[in-house]
Amino acid sequence: MDQFATISMEQARERWRQGEAVLVDIRDPQSFAAGHLRGAFHLTNDTLPAFLAQHDLARPVMVLCYHGNSSKGAAQYLLTQGVEVAYSVDGGFDAWLKAFPLETESL
């Protein structure tokens, strides 16, 4: 995959629940600590090397940000780092929270 793709919240939720893809959250640490999707990996500049070393690069990665904008650049960047399939989740965390409010947790 040379270019990231977008994925709807519903499609992302289904792939995530089925274990078909990993979900990464690129929001700032305070926002992530205040609330995030259960099981989401907090991907930052500091955690990126460990993520790439531990993640099966053939397994799709779905990137979640605030509103679905920053995730596009992050998804494209992950492709340049060896991830084979990357998606930007449409609507981001805010839209996911409105659609599926009971799937979050805080630190």
Curated annotation (Swiss-Prot):
As for subcellular location, the record says: Cytoplasm
**InterPro entries assigned to the protein according to its UniProt record, in alphabetical order:** GlpE_sulfurtransferase (IPR050229), Rhodanese-like_dom (IPR001763), Rhodanese-like_dom_sf (IPR036873), Thiosulf_sulfurTrfase (IPR023695)
Query: Is Cytoplasm included in the keywords of this UniProt record?
Result: yes
Q: Does the keyword Transferase apply?
A: yes
Enzymatic reactions: thiosulfate + hydrogen cyanide = thiocyanate + sulfite + 2 H(+); thiosulfate + [thioredoxin]-dithiol = [thioredoxin]-disulfide + hydrogen sulfide + sulfite + 2 H(+)
Major localisation: cytoplasm
Q: Which UniProt keywords apply?
A: Cytoplasm, Transferase
Q: Which GO terms describe its biological process?
A: glycerol metabolic process
Q: Residue ranges of the Rhodanese domain?
A: 17-105
Listed GO MF terms:
thiosulfate-cyanide sulfurtransferase activity
**Which residues are connected by disulfide bridges in this protein?**
none
Q: What does this protein do?
A: Transferase that catalyzes the transfer of sulfur from thiosulfate to thiophilic acceptors such as cyanide or dithiols. May function in a CysM-independent thiosulfate assimilation pathway by catalyzing the conversion of thiosulfate to sulfite, which can then be used for L-cysteine biosynthesis.
The similarity comment for this entry is: Belongs to the GlpE family.
In Swiss-Prot or TrEMBL terms, this protein is called Thiosulfate sulfurtransferase GlpE
Q: What lineage does UniProt assign to this protein's organism?
A: Bacteria, Pseudomonadati, Pseudomonadota, Gammaproteobacteria, Enterobacterales
